Regions:
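AMP-forming adenylation/ATP pyrophosphatase catalytic core
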Residues: 1-111
Length: 111
């Protein structure tokens, strides 16, 4: 079971992932609220409550709906806020991690 790796402002290299945390908007970046962010591979028990959805859905199902085949899911980073899955590139940001106030936003970019 891979561990979470804490992320710091600026550029982060975690395995094959190159991740940037910044307060500057960027194309394809995930807009999230500030906090203790970390990254890890997806886990079977992960789920997200996407804004406007009718409740929590499994990440497995969300990835499948977006056409990510099972053999590629381990390559998808899961960004965690305070240890909980909160944002996934190509899927979205959990309602709990959406920025509460304009200007108080962190942008997570994957290269």
């Amino acid at each position: 079971r891979p561990e979470e790796t804490p992320l710091h402002p600026g550029d982060n290299r975690v395995g094959a992932w190159h991740i940037r945390l910044s307060d500057t908007p960027a194309p394809d970046a995930l807009a999230v609220r500030p906090g203790a962010w970390s990254v890890r591979p997806w886990r079977r028990e992960d789920g997200l409550t996407l804004p406007g959805s009718r409740g929590r859905r499994s990440l497995k199902r969300l990835l499948a709906e977006r056409g990510v085949p099972p053999e590629q899911r381990d390559a998808v980073p899961v960004f965690c806020l305070a240890g909980q899955a909160a944002a996934v590139p190509g899927v979205g940001v959990d309602a709990s991690a959406v920025p509460e106030q304009p200007g108080n936003t962190i942008y997570i970019q994957l290269f």
